[in-house]
């Protein structure tokens, strides 16, 4: 063995002794090369994400205009984690959590940890403490825009606090990112949209909280309402587009289209029907939808209602959709190779 190799081996032993086993290794020895995921609670979004759900131990940003469905998308993820026996937490900086609506989406509100912090620092410190405990599987911060720094709250109404929130987020994410990765916690940051003043060309929209969250996020989702869903003259929900604008674990820019029904959340029947029709698993002839020569109903809403009443048939169709896209039933726990190892 050469002197250089002996010196390297000694240095590696010293590093492992000081910082623990696994603190340094060769890239090819990486034990876990695949991304472990948890379903988003929406089959269409699981497919758009490319790995079958949200990657564990990563930061996710969900942003969009007001009332576009950001919190609904996050609550579905919480419900899915709880369904698998995991622990969830919700940092409600907006003080707008509706427990009745959350319950309708499948969230077990008796087990959900809820914090309504007074300041941005307090909210992020609570989030850090929960992440470092290693006992929380998913944490949702709603929203970044509402994480107001203490200095701004204690100051007068007209005071200028330029860059204060951006500095707070930058510092918090520097501390949080490593802990999130080690604890395998999914951290979802909900964010709002602001208009940049004086932008003549390009997109004038931006998200508050500075650039740090954009950099630290593994996945960024843009949620926007596409059209209203009507039953007769009544508006019963919105067709919503969820665009994956950044993805470090699969190809980005895929779009999931879902029906968000008032009081119900994401319509599983709607997304299954649309995806199955695209793949010709369900055949559409005129206004009629059919599966294996069995008629589901005339028109989309009637077919959705039929699938709602026949859950075994609905899940059978969902199985074939997952199989076509290579997503396993356990939310794609095998995932895909982690491309961030090469970032």
Swiss-Prot record:
One of its GO terms (molecular function) is single-stranded DNA binding. ATP binds at residues 64-71. Belongs to the RecA family. Keywords: ATP-binding, Cytoplasm, DNA damage, DNA recombination, DNA repair, DNA-binding, Nucleotide-binding, SOS response. One of its GO terms (cellular component) is cytoplasm. InterPro entries: AAA+_ATPase (IPR003593), DNA_recomb/repair_RecA (IPR013765), DNA_recomb/repair_RecA_CS (IPR020584), P-loop_NTPase (IPR027417), RecA-like_C (IPR049261), RecA-like_N (IPR049428), RecA_ATP-bd (IPR020588), RecA_C_sf (IPR023400). PROSITE patterns: RECA_1 (PS00321), RECA_2 (PS50162), RECA_3 (PS50163). PANTHER family: MITOCHONDRIAL DNA REPAIR PROTEIN RECA HOMOLOG-RELATED, RECA. This is Protein RecA. It is found in: Cytoplasm. Its main location: cytoplasm. SUPFAM superfamilies: P-loop containing nucleoside triphosphate hydrolases (SSF52540), RecA protein, C-terminal domain (SSF54752). Can catalyze the hydrolysis of ATP in the presence of single-stranded DNA, the ATP-dependent uptake of single-stranded DNA by duplex DNA, and the ATP-dependent hybridization of homologous single-stranded DNAs. It interacts with LexA causing its activation and leading to its autocatalytic cleavage. GO terms for biological process: DNA recombination; DNA repair; SOS response. Pfam families: RecA, RecA_C.
